[in-house]
């Protein structure tokens, strides 16, 4: 499948033989209420103020652990000499957004399969056709290398959207 020039799909692939490391740090926020001790409420009822969620701070993650909806400040280099990426809140400037994770077979057609899956998953996530959108598509392939043949789709394609003009995104492309 060929897409217009600005929507060229490219792959960054790697054989990932290491265990995936993930940080499960708890996120917390600070809630405050404005209480005036000199003027207590006239009734026994007290007002409750819902805490404002703290903005999600940037975190480092291995790219094989990326999830749909993650926004990336940076992409791993094509040679995959770095296996981590910085995930940021989508409201901040970012270079790419994950819109699909899909299992794929590892064979000679892996690139064709990744192209097909990423193209098919684009419209359901963004509400737009890849051909008429302001985005280009890229993907990463996590090759689990199940050599037993027990898993017919041992790899995962991680589809990313990026601005076709090379600028940064602000906000999510999810519809």
Curated annotation (Swiss-Prot):
For the region Disordered, what residue ranges are annotated? 31-56
Q: Does the keyword Membrane apply?
A: yes
Sites of S-diacylglycerol cysteine lipidation: 21
Note whether Cell membrane occurs among the keywords. Answer: yes
The domain section of the record reads: Fragments of the mature protein (residues 61-80, 101-120 and 121-140) prevent uptake of M.tuberculosis by a human macrophage-like cell line.
Biological function: Probably involved in bacterial recognition and uptake by its host (human).
**UniProt protein name:** Putative lipoprotein LppN
Organism whose genome encodes this protein? Mycobacterium tuberculosis (strain ATCC 25618 / H37Rv)
Gene name?
lppN
């Amino acid at each position: 499948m060929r897409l217009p020039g600005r929507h060229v799909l490219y792959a960054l692939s790697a054989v990932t033989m290491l265990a995936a490391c993930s940080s499960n740090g708890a996120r917390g926020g600070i809630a405050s209420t404005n209480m005036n001790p000199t003027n207590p409420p006239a009734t026994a009822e007290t007002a409750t103020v819902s805490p404002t969620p703290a903005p999600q701070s940037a975190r480092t993650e291995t790219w094989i652990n990326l999830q749909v909806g993650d926004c990336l400040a940076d992409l791993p280099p094509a040679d995959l000499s770095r296996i981590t990426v910085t995930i940021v809140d989508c409201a901040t400037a970012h270079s790419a957004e994950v819109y699909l994770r899909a299992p794929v077979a590892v064979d000679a057609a892996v690139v064709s399969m990744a192209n097909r899956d990423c193209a098919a998953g684009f419209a359901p996530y963004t509400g737009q056709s890849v051909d008429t959108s302001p985005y280009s598509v890229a993907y990463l392939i996590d090759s689990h290398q199940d050599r037993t043949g027990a898993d017919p789709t041992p790899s995962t394609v991680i589809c990313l959207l990026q601005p076709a003009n090379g600028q940064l995104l602000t906000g999510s492309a999810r519809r």
